[in-house]
């Protein structure tokens, strides 16, 4: 095996998906602790202050105490290199989260044992399903009262449409939580709470049918054995092929706060989750062990460092090897660049990088020329597929306070839209500018950044737009006919694409019925 192939085989790149408050931040901390990336878990604190977690860079995040940005963290574990992409928990930032999921090979789904499957989890699983992403599941908070575990598995299967295969099974919960039983290994992992950075070596009891197990379970023993028979009769067994194809999820139980069960999940990622996979480009499929470097940008983060008005483009390496000072081609601009200052991440602690391999995430300094979806190669003209723009759910008309600054306003909105969290639309029939976003908070972010970075003050007005759909049609004549009839509701988006701004849900349904040859798409790819 070549050195490059060996490095690729070591990589595991995954994201954590969950509903806000299911315990994602705590799990992230415990995972980093396993890789010794932080010495004291129980809070990813900034090294310079105790007030803010390291991943909260932007002023607005600090003021509101939510993670708006996607953090990327790399750490070693069991002779592997783990790339963990943390996704924003706040509901307004789903588009950023969705695109992050295009850069990973697997995902860890965290569920609150007391609440089960929640709306955000469903939305994120829908995105994972588009790419058949393998999912490992962790049912968290067993140190509290949880719902019946069998009921939770049924809910995963019914709501998320994926088979659930329990690997561990909880022995009691809350004050009676005694640990988990490993179904295939026939052993008990005893629960001893470890808080903060304590990692207590787990005590193992071999075989459920043993005096030691009977003593540990006490009067719960008989009912637990009965429950297990039911579970083993009713549940799916783990199957590696079904897992890799996104049809089955192995399920683990534990408590991240009590530092119990998180290592089982990380072991599953190392043992079962795929190494970096081939990536589909418009031209061909790119394999990770190819010699030549390729990568695509899935996220742009502006102003990670307020001292320099910088933007960092986050790139997933798809093949080859990044070496400091190498030359790469920015395919969309057909321009060669020498990259000597790519970054690796521990949240906002950034370090310059000497080398990186397929599966790794690196940061490129971006002075406004890099866009989401851009491909970089060593010369080949490639464009990776599957990096989506989603139709916004909220719309506002932008009103300029100083009419003389309309040029700066357009420029600012266009540049901020390039980061992919908001989208800008220019109606065909008016001089209005309409801003679309997936959450209300984004409008505040844009207004404050226009003011700080572009010296433009704007206000928002309500507008009757229910949703946007990108328009395409194979029949040119039909498209022209549609454009003439629907002109009132048509706009051009920031990327120059024709868009239908539907005033109501009913209007959209009627238009889709009336114009069967026109495709009304809720997503479009970045090009």
From Swiss-Prot:
Residues engaged in binding GTP: 18-25, 86-90, 140-143
Residues covered by the tr-type G domain: 9-277
GO cellular component: cytosol
Superkingdom of this protein's organism: Bacteria
CDD domains per record: RF3 (cd04169), RF3_II (cd03689), RF3_III (cd16259)
Biological function: Increases the formation of ribosomal termination complexes and stimulates activities of RF-1 and RF-2. It binds guanine nucleotides and has strong preference for UGA stop codons. It may interact directly with the ribosome. The stimulation of RF-1 and RF-2 is significantly reduced by GTP and GDP, but not by GMP.
Full protein name: Peptide chain release factor 3
Organism this protein belongs to: Pseudomonas entomophila (strain L48)
Gene: prfC
């Amino acid at each position: 095996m070549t050195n490059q192939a060996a490095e690729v085989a070591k990589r595991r790149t995954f994201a954590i998906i969950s509903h806000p408050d299911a315990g994602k931040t705590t799990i992230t901390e415990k995972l980093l602790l396993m890789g010794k990336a932080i010495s004291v878990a129980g809070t990813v604190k900034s090294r310079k202050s105790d007030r803010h977690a390291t991943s909260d860079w932007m002023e607005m995040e600090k003021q509101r105490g939510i993670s708006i940005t996607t953090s990327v963290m790399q750490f070693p574990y069991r002779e592997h290199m783990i790339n963990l992409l943390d996704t924003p928990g706040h509901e307004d930032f789903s588009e950023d989260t969705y695109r992050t999921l295009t850069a990973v090979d697997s995902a860890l789904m965290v569920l609150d044992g007391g609440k089960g499957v929640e709306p955000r989890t469903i939305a994120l699983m829908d995105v994972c399903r588009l790419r058949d992403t393998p999912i490992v599941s962790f049912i968290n908070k067993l140190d509290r009262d949880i719902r019946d575990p069998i009921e939770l598995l049924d809910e995963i299967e019914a709501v998320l449409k994926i088979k659930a295969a329990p690997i561990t099974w909880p022995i009691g919960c809350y004050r009676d939580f005694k640990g988990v039983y490993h179904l295939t290994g026939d052993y008990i992992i005893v629960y001893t709470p470890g808080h903060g950075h304590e990692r207590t070596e787990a005590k193992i009891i071999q075989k459920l049918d043993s005096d030691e197990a009977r003593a540990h379970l006490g009067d719960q023993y008989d009912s637990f054995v009965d429950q297990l028979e039911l579970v083993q009769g009713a549940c799916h067994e783990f199957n590696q092929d079904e897992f890799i194809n996104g049809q089955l999820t192995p399920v683990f139980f534990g408590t991240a706060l009590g530092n119990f069960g998180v290592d089982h999940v990380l072991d599953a990622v190392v043992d079962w989750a795929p190494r970096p996979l081939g990536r589909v480009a418009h031209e061909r499929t790119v394999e990770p062990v190819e010699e030549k470097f390729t990568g695509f940008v899935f996220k742009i983060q502006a102003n990670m460092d307020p001292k320099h008005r910088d933007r960092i483009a986050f790139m997933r390496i798809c093949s080859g090897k990044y070496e400091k000072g190498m030359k790469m081609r920015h395919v969309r601009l057909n321009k060669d660049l020498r990259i000597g200052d790519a970054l690796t991440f521990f949240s906002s602690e950034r370090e310059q990088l000497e080398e990186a391999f397929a599966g790794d995430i690196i940061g490129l300094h971006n002075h406004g020329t890099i866009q989401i979806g851009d491909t970089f190669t060593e010369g080949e003209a490639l464009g990776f597929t599957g990096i989506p723009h989603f139709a916004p759910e909220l719309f506002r008309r932008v009103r300029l306070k100083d009419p003389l600054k309309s040029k700066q306003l357009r420029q600012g909105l266009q540049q901020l839209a390039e980061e992919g969290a908001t989208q800008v639309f220019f109606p065909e029939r008016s001089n209005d500018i309409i801003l679309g976003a997936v959450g209300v908070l984004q409008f505040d972010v844009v207004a404050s950044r226009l003011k700080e970075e572009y010296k433009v003050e704007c206000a928002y007005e309500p507008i009757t737009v229910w949703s946007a759909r990108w328009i395409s049609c194979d029949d040119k004549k039909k498209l022209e006919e549609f454009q003439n009839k629907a002109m009132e509701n048509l706009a051009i988006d920031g990327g120059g694409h024709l868009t239908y701004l539907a005033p109501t849900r009913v209007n959209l349904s009627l238009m889709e019925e009336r114009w069967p040859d026109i495709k009304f798409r809720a997503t479009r790819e970045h090009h």
